[in-house]
């Protein structure tokens, strides 16, 4: 919760690659089911992207999520510093309630004054394209609410089970992949 004891109305996810694309895609696709704060995604090192996002938000009701596997990615760190400065310029109290970090490098995170209880850690071995199923999915959880997020995870588990247990001729991911290969290599379609 923000310092004013109300609920956050906005969440800014600062990340790039897998720390941005997956959560951004899912929150966009599931927008009709949102039951939480509005999520904004900033990945561009061009400061105009972040400034355009910040100008319409109330820092008192905004949570900044800094998502970076290594916490050394220049685009993410540059935007994170700017967002932290924005909070400091507008809030007279400690900004720690308005910051969380998601990273596999907690040592680096702590250099930014983010305490252990505000860090969601994940294994360095988790690849970017799969990270939305773990802590990187925090913006999805916040946007959807706990119940709908658990339904989302349950659906993913069902598809995993389907993939591992169905015969090839009944296996939807395999059939889609084979159809894609057929369209591209045999039919010579230039797009999917």
Give residue ranges: language-model regions.
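A glycine- and small-aliphatic-rich helix-loop capping segment at beta-alpha/alpha-beta transitions
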Residues: 21-36, 56-58, 78-88, 113-119
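Conserved beta-strand elements of the Class I
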Residues: 10-14, 63, 100
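Alpha-helix capping and helix-loop boundary segments enriched in small/acidic/polar residues
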Residues: 40-54, 67-78, 96-100, 123-130, ...
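Cofactor-/ligand-binding subdomain signature composed of acidic, glycine-rich
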Residues: 1-9
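Glycine-rich oxoanion-binding loops at beta->alpha junctions
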Residues: 1, 26-28, 32-63
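Active-site phosphate/pyrophosphate-binding segments
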Residues: 86-192
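Gly/Ser/Thr-rich loops at beta-strand to alpha-helix junctions
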Residues: 12-22, 69-77, 106-108, 127-128
């Amino acid at each position: 919760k923000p310092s004013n004891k109300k609920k956050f109305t906005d969440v800014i996810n600062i990340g790039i690659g897998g720390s941005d694309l997956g959560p951004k895609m899912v929150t966009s696709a599931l927008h009709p089911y949102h039951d939480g704060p509005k999520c904004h995604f900033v990945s561009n090192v061009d400061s105009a992207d972040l400034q355009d996002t910040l100008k319409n938000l109330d820092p008192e009701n905004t949570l900044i999520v800094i998502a970076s596997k290594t916490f050394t990615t220049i685009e993410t760190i540059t935007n994170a510093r700017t967002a932290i400065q924005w909070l400091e310029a507008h809030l007279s109290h400690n900004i720690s309630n308005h910051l969380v970090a998601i990273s596999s490098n907690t040592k680096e995170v702590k250099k930014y004054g983010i305490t252990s209880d505000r860090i969601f850690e994940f294994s360095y071995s988790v690849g970017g394209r799969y990270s939305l199923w773990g802590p990187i999915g925090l913006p999805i959880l916040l946007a959807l609410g706990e119940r709908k997020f658990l339904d989302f995870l349950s659906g993913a588990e069902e598809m995993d089970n389907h993939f591992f247990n169905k015969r090839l001729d009944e296996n939807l991911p395999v059939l889609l992949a084979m159809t894609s290969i057929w369209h591209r290599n045999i039919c010579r379609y230039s797009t999917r």
